[in-house]
Amino acid sequence: MPELPPDLQRILRESFFIRATMTRRKSGTPRTVELTFRWDGGSKIVLSGYPGKRDWVANMAANPDVTMHTVEFDPWYDIPARARVVRDRKERLPHLLAYIEHWAGRPGFPRGRVMFFLGAVKLNRRLHLPWWGPFWFARRIFDKMPCVDLTFTGEPVLRATGGPPPLSEPREGRP
């Protein structure tokens, strides 16, 4: 894939939120949700969030072709991508640590405490120590956090109309 336009690179580097339009696994209808992400500086982003099961993860596992939409800055872009749910702990952990580190850079976040904790977890992993004490608790959180790796599959498209597409309405009994 060719290099992304400079304004899109800036948007992905400075943003914390992105919208994804995917196909629902049961009904086959489109769904647009707003998610948190981290861009790798190339053609991939990692989606994650609070621990727990998420419908959007199941939708992307069943129908991996998605469209990402920038939301925080203009100009607005639509980017076709292919999703892959990352399930292996050893593969997930570096993605999740980088995601949390990016998220900790957001204004108003208690960065010092989070960065200290992340440094301790990274040291624990580098030394191949067991997941004991507070690290056991951290591992349980990391194991329950969603982790979806998206690879851009086509050229970003500058959106003709202002703003990203609207979010889908919540379904009965779902957030």
Where are these regions (language model features)?
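Short, conserved active-site entrance elements at the starts or edges of catalytic domains
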Residues: 1-30, 167-175
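Conserved hydrophobic/aromatic beta-strand scaffold that supports enzyme active sites
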Residues: 32, 147-149
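Extracellular/periplasmic catalytic domains that process cell-envelope and extracellular macromolecules
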Residues: 11, 38-39, 141-142
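Short beta-strand segments
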Residues: 15-50, 66, 78-80
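A short secondary-structure junction signal
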Residues: 32, 160-163
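A broad, low-specificity signal for short, low-complexity segments enriched in glycine/proline
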Residues: 1, 5-9, 28-32, 39-44, ...
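Short, structured beta-strand-loop surface elements
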Residues: 51-134, 142-144, 151-156, 163
